[in-house]
Amino acid sequence: PLRLVGSEMCIRDSINGFHGDCACTIPCGEVSEEARKLIAVTRQSFYEGIKFARKGNRISDISNAIQTYVEAQGFSLVRDYVGHGVGANLHEDPEVPNFGRPGHGVRLQPGMTLAIEPMVNVGTYAVKVLPDGWTVKTADGKLSAHYENSIAITEGDPVILTFPTDGENW
């Protein structure tokens, strides 16, 4: 079992009844150039997607921007897991796939909060769940990376809600 010690930090995923969702893949030690590129492409695909996270656009406009960027870099996107609405519950509607044709799905409105989370693979997009029921791996055993932040749709540019308030960016 995991035990926290006094000098360790922990993460809080809700404040005043509202949730946020974020994740990132970071290199540990020496990693291959392919792994570094995968991590960079995954992170950038989030930013490519949120360029379309604007009032009046549709969910699939975000999805298509992510897919177009990732596939142009020679990678694939996990299709079994998607981004989602976030708020009073950690996972809410609407679903936000990382792939698809533009112009479909829910129309974005100010006040909506979404978790945008590209999951990018070196090989096939297919994944498998291990017998523990929790761990997910690529079906072909190749590398995968994940980058996620919660955003708010506004009258103008989207606001990234899960960035630290001290100006640091991960």
Task: Please report, for each region that a protein language model flagged, where it lies by residue.
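Acidic-aromatic/histidine active-site loop/patch
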Residues: 149
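Short acidic-glycine loop/turn motifs at beta-strand connectors
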Residues: 153-157
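Residue-level recognition of short, solvent-exposed, well-ordered loop/turn junctions
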Residues: 3-4, 54, 109, 146
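Conserved, well-structured core segments that form or line functional sites
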Residues: 14-20, 27, 31-115, 119-125
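A conserved acidic, glycine/proline-rich C-terminal tail/linker
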Residues: 98-104, 120-144, 168
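N-terminal segments that mediate ammonia production and transfer
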Residues: 161-164, 170
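Single conserved hydrophobic/aromatic residue that forms the stacking wall/gate
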Residues: 1-6, 11
